[in-house]
Amino acid sequence: MRVVAAILYINVVVALICGLGIQGGALDLQDYPSVSFQGDAMQLQDYPSITFNLKGATWQTYRDFIEKLREIVTRGATTIAGTSIPVLNRVVPDSRRFVYVRLINLDGNVVTIAVDVTSLYVVAFSANNNGYFFSDSTETERTNLFVGIPRGDPLGFTGNYNSLENWAGADRGSIPLGPALLNKAIRNLRSNGRDSKAAKSLIVVIQMVSEAARFRRIEEQVRRSIADQDTFTPGSLMITMEKKWSKMSQQVERSVNDQGIFTGIFTRTVQLIDDNLQTLNIDNFNALSLHTMLAILLFRCRTTTSSHNTLPAASNIVLMGEDYVDKDDEKCTVGEPTRRISGRAGWCVDVKDGRDNDGNPIQVLSCGDGQERKQQWTFHRDGTIRSKLGKCMTAYGFKHGEYVMIYDCDTAIAGANKWVVSIDGTITNPISGLVLTAPRGATGTTLLVEKNVHAARQCWRVGDDVEPIVTKIVGFQEKCLEANYLENTNVSRYTKVFLDDCVLDRQQQRWALYSDGTIRADSDRSLRVTADGHRSLDSIIILACKGWGNQRWVFNTDGTILNPNAKLVMDVKDSDVSLLQIILHQSTGKPNQKWLTVTLPRTS
């Protein structure tokens, strides 16, 4: 029977060769790594396969490759409510557990890596017709991957970054990345899968594949290196992002409240380090997204709106470079974090004079240390927002224009002290549908509840770091958003916003993102990106601050930048950079409407 099975196997291979039109060449079995025998019968594990070929590679082909990998690993996954960010499936049947990623270098050398769809973890690879497994490989991996080809000697290291770095004799911060380094890594893995060169090569491969799929910021760095045919060395922000992916995922998933609304308020801070070695204490989703462009979440807990997978629990996942072991398929616990609320012009929501009497107004005031008692608020699961003074943020009534005060939580009018925090920055009273508003652009302004017109004066960020986030905004064809205003001149003469080649130190490409949803010129923060109207095809320009709806923007997780007042997105007109025109447009999902933030390190 084994002879018969072998003959059948040969026939299948011949059929595959003929079907693909391969003539006169030897078959490389790693092109068919899922062929296996069970008993006397041949089996085909139908794992999907994708390819990235460095020959003729462009940033566009790399972008498409990463997008396809994301699509495969998130099939059947749920998304976080109100976002487009998928959560990887906690468990999947073995028949869908892996994806093969074929990497081809300039010499035609092929290395195939196996990626676990539950973690984006590289778990094995094949090179030179041999399959290689890490020293901590599981039975599931050894049983299902690279069967039908010889097994190389077991690797002396695990797939964890700590083990790889030890074997490589170098840490990630000293190992360059880029197309030339990926080309070399494929060659090294092809020639020798077991030595220190292999460990170093795997560090390159893992970051340029798995980490780029997890974070659009890393994808963007690789894309730019391909476009420029250059290399880059991971900075401290990239490395801490890689280390904290699990913790990020946990905090995002625990930001869905008991009503299934994604507030984006973290229970615990995620600490990152920027490239100037300054600490970033990230305690809300908006800041996390702007700094990391997080694209995929690891399953950490079941959110209120997630479906529960009833398959048997998967084996514990030990993540690359992390000190966390994910154990439980448990429901997310929603905390009651205490944070500042900042909004118009970056000012903080403040209890006037720090007095705790019922009816005392709530205002906006400059944020300051030592003012925690009157500028910090606890977000309770019952929908109340409570001052450290012990009283609730309460609307005086349910009519447009009523003022907002602190009041005893138990004796306030029913529903007047309930609030819904939305990921777009709106804080709404669910009874009246009115939203928290700072009506005037001056400190000491008393807050009101008003009809939602999606104005900047109605946008808030919940988080203790109230400083604007300074960033470049990268758009179509890897070019940067730029304004052609000149300092110390009449700004009305220099109002155009357009795309140009990214230049690191060009001031006109630096933008400050404020808590009120405004995008401001970093060198003159009185100037805002403004929609010159509310209709499709209206231009986007620079104007002085007004607090209007046409000056508020939302960076969506799908890569669009939305003006919520017009319900239109930022668009490169006609996908033609040479027109030097950015406009409002209905969302189409096309590349000329996709944007990335590349945040800049803070000065010490």
Curated annotation (Swiss-Prot):
Record keywords: Disulfide bond, Glycoprotein, Hydrolase, Lectin, Plant defense, Protein synthesis inhibitor, Repeat, Signal, Toxin
Keyword Signal: yes
Gene3D superfamilies: 2.80.10.50, Ricin (A subunit), domain 1, Ricin (A Subunit), domain 2
Domain of life: Eukaryota
Mapped 1-alpha repeat ranges: 345-387
CDD domains to which the protein is assigned, alphabetical: beta-trefoil_Ricin_ebulin-like_rpt1, beta-trefoil_Ricin_ebulin-like_rpt2
Self-association state and partner proteins as the record states: Disulfide-linked dimer of A and B chains.
Stated family: Belongs to the ribosome-inactivating protein family. Type 2 RIP subfamily.
Function (record text): Gal/GalNAc-specific agglutinin. Behaves as a type-2 ribosome-inactivating protein. Inhibits mammalian ribosomes. The A chain is responsible for inhibiting protein synthesis through the catalytic inactivation of 60S ribosomal subunits by removing adenine from position 4,324 of 28S rRNA. The B chain binds to cell receptors and probably facilitates the entry into the cell of the A chain; B chains are also responsible for cell agglutination (lectin activity). Involved in plant defense against insects. Has very low cytotoxic activity against the human tumor cell line Molt4, but higher against CEM.
The protein's name in its UniProt record: Ribosome-inactivating protein PMRIPm
Organism expressing this protein natively: Polygonatum multiflorum (Solomon's seal)
